């Protein structure tokens, strides 16, 4: 998290937080439409334009500011891995 510019207090808040995310899928439309440009907000609050690609039937992939984000849906599990160089951040959630 430090590698993407998050200060220590936000890193600690991220470790302590228990959140709920809503994911709604209608065909190839999630909150973004696959393969079209969309604006996303980074963990530092910066808004960036990126393209989200769908790989297979259950994986969303995008790259922004040198970070590769892969979100995979398997049954009731949502796994997200973000990679910056040799640093990998993984989060697993339940639907």
From Swiss-Prot:
The modification N6-succinyllysine is found at residues 13, 18, 28, 39, 47, 59, 90. InterPro entries: Calycin. GO terms for molecular function: lipid binding. Keywords: Cytoplasm, Lipid-binding, Phosphoprotein, Transport. One of its GO terms (cellular component) is cytoplasm. The modification Phosphothreonine is found at residue 33. It is found in: Cytoplasm. This protein binds free fatty acids and their coenzyme A derivatives, bilirubin, and some other small molecules in the cytoplasm; it may be involved in intracellular lipid transport. This is Fatty acid-binding protein, liver. It comes from Chaetophractus villosus. The gene is FABP1.
